Amino acid sequence: MKIVLLGAPGAGKGTLAKDLSIMFSVPHISTGDMFREAVAAGTELGVKVQNILSSGALVPDEIVNQVVEERLRKQDCEKGFIFDGYPRTIAQAIALDEILQKMSKKLDLAIYLEASEETVVKRLTSRRICPKCGKIYNLISMPPVSDQICDDCGEQLVIREDDKEEVVRKRYRLYLETTAPLVEYYSGRDILVSVNSERDHRKLVEDVSRLLKKVIS
């Protein structure tokens, strides 16, 4: 099962990908998480990425594609993968096709999560993350048991720089300019499915998992 999840920042790609990863036993590959790990490690790449993410801009394709190819060649991707946040552009989509072709593989499905700008802003500005274990919360839909404290490890939750409203709106505009055309790209290849991500998350997971079971059966 080889799929990509498309949609604006805050459409719910990461949460859905994690649920599907557990359900189907394939890795959830998030370039965003990889970059944040690099930032935390303080590597040269991490410093570059930190400056880019803090400004709300996108990481250059050359860096992204290199990280992706290295990840896909790991053994746990043999049976499939779920991409969250990649590809973001037509150029990245073409690069992914070329990477998979070298590995004698191809995408099974591209799932587009539809969400309005105001929904995205509301979700992301309410999002909090544990700096220690990486668990993600939402103060509205998935709050921690104790205010601003991680349920799992007791750390104080933080808001990421790229979840502040000004940056969120900038990211949404960038999404419209660069990522939205991917919907047409994958639709033209007849592997696109669009779903409404503004509904109850459990219902969304149920519907998407049912769809994927048909694809891999």
Curated annotation (Swiss-Prot):
Mention one GO biological process in which this protein takes part, according to its record: AMP salvage
Top-level class of the enzyme under EC nomenclature: transferase
Q: Where in the cell is it found?
A: Cytoplasm
- Enumerate the residues binding Zn(2+): C130, C133, C150, C153
Bilayer-spanning residue ranges:
none
Q: Name one GO molecular function term.
A: adenylate kinase activity
Which PROSITE patterns does this entry report, sorted A to Z?
A: ADENYLATE_KINASE
Query: What are the record's GO terms for cellular component?
Result: cytoplasm
Q: Which residues bind AMP?
A: T31, R36, A57, L58, V59, G85, Y86, P87, R88, Q92, R160, R171
> Which residues does the record give as ATP binding sites?
G10, A11, G12, K13, G14, T15, R127, I136, Y137, R199
Pfam families attached to this UniProt entry: ADK, ADK_lid
Q: What does the subunit comment say?
A: Monomer.
> What HAMAP family does the entry give?
Adenylate_kinase_Adk
The name this protein carries in UniProt is: Adenylate kinase
Lineage of source species: Bacteria, Thermotogati, Thermotogota, Thermotogae, Thermotogales
